[in-house]
Amino acid sequence: IFQFDMWGVEPSDKYDWKSLADKIMKNGIRNSLLLAPMPTASTSQILGNNECFEPITSNIYSRSTLAGEFIIANKHLMKDLIKLNMWNEDVKNNIIANKGSIQQITSIPEHIRNKYKIVWEIPMKHIIDMAADRGAFICQSQSLNLWQEDPTYNSLTSMHFYGWKKGLKTGIYYLRRKAKHQAQQFTIGPEKKEEECVMCSA
């Protein structure tokens, strides 16, 4: 019996599951549990990838790990904008000013904005649904992080029960929330201003 059998899921015929089952019944298996997808922050960021199966948290941000501090840009977004001849200093600064989101940058085509939504712009129901789709092929469990800008007792209860009804073994690993007060964007603003003469302004 495979994991997907216990979930009542019929897999595609891409792989020969019958032959694998026959080999296991004949020869046994070394480990009873094989899969447990987990966050891999340091290695993921160093190699330019996002953590595990998580949605991206920002299209441009700095990341501190045990290995040091790194400036991270969404390389896939950059590639798409370069193809459209749209990647430039102004766009980069606008993304920073919008806290890593591109949803308010209307010069970027809608299909690109839809493709690169950050985690705060994605319904958690979709994240839980995708976790359930993976769950049928994960024998142990998965480290599922969820995000809510302003979590409440009702929203958390609803989220937990939805995941439970979908059959998730781990309801939640970390709950991420936004800080009540956002840090001031000292480094960049949506528009650059000419520097004024300090002596002249007296």
Where are these regions (language model features)?
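Residues immediately within or flanking Cys/His clusters that coordinate Zn2+
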Residues: 194
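Short glycine-cluster motifs
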Residues: 1-23
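Cys/His/Pro-rich metal-binding microdomains
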Residues: 198
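Catalytic alpha/beta core of large soluble enzyme barrels
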Residues: 11-14, 23-30, 35-191, 201-202
